[in-house]
A protein has these predicted regions:
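Short alpha-helical elements
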Residues: 1-293
Length: 293
């Protein structure tokens, strides 16, 4: 058995234990490869940085599951499994973030194509509600065309929740979504989330204390607590890992459904490796560039 197949079996056994279900939705003809086996294959591909499906099917040719699925079916079923991958991810997150009270919110740009090609590009323009558009990332001083990944992570570097918005949407609007997902915690953000109205609203509605650094020209200015500044770097490190190891900025999807499924697959893989590191291997959860077998 190859190292790759052994890693696949390890991921599969743990995901089976977490989900407790083999198939998640009805199929008139039962496929040879179950849904949980397919999700394990998706996680393996992202962990090994195999971003080409053609390359993935060459790699698994000698696997026991190799003849059980075709490439076209793999892609179609992968998109249908989007809500179930997120469901499994949330089960892992609930265990990893069980005793967390401090979280960090931030965003990063997801470029679909260069601005010069944006007028003739047809990528992700298949649905009206999710058209990509032009935006600006202040931290990188970057004008880009595409989407923003808005995310919340714990101080132990586990993504609690995330969302994708068009590039032009201001970061602060994501806080309205957070209100429906979280409560009774401290949320750390940068100056982009500075708003007294939203700060009061979050506290009154769901008891979330929003902590942001204040601008130097504000009347009640005082430097932010040093430990909070240090915590805020955690999410930036996570974004760097998504870009480096999981190649989140490399996009081959043509539809929005395909695009968001790729993003979820990468974040779910990150969470899976963190889960295995903590509960199976007993090591630092953020040792991501490490062999499973």
């Amino acid at each position: 058995m190859s190292n790759l197949e052994a890693s696949y079996n390890l991921i599969l056994n743990n995901l089976r234990e977490i989900s407790g279900i083999e198939d998640f939705y009805f199929k008139p003809i039962k496929p040879k490869l179950s849904d949980i086996e397919l999700i394990s294959l998706i996680i393996l591909a992202e962990f090994k940085s195999i971003d080409s499906e053609h390359q993935l099917f060459r790699e698994i040719k000698g696997f026991e599951i190799g003849p059980n699925i075709e490439r076209s079916v793999y892609n179609r079923r992968k998109r249908k499994l989007f809500p179930f991958i997120e469901e499994i991810r949330m089960k892992m997150v609930d265990k990893l973030n069980e005793s967390e009270n401090y979280f960090i919110v931030d965003s990063m740009p997801l470029e679909v194509c260069k601005i010069s090609r944006s007028f003739r590009s047809k990528i992700c323009k298949d649905v009206d509600y999710a058209y990509p558009n032009k935006g600006f990332c202040a931290s990188q001083n970057l004008h880009f065309y595409g989407y923003k990944l808005n995310a919340v992570c714990s101080i132990s570097s586990v993504f609690q929740s995330f969302d994708i918005s068009p590039a032009s949407v201001h970061d602060i609007h994501y806080l309205q979504d957070i209100k429906l997902q979280m409560s009774d915690c401290v949320l750390l953000g940068d100056k982009g989330y500075l708003s007294q109205t939203i700060q009061l609203d979050l506290f009154k509605e769901v008891n979330i204390e929003l902590e942001t650094p204040k601008r130097k020209n504000q009347k009640d200015y005082k430097p932010q607590f040093y430990q909070f500044k240090k915590y805020r770097k955690r999410i930036e490190t996570l974004f760097s890992q998504l870009c480096d190891q999981f190649m989140i900025r490399r996009n081959y999807a043509k539809t929005f459904q395909g695009f968001k499924t790729r993003i979820l697959a990468k974040i779910a893989t990150l969470t899976t490796i963190q889960y295995l590191n903590k509960f199976l291997f007993g090591r630092n959860i953020n040792n991501l560039k490490i062999n499973l077998i």
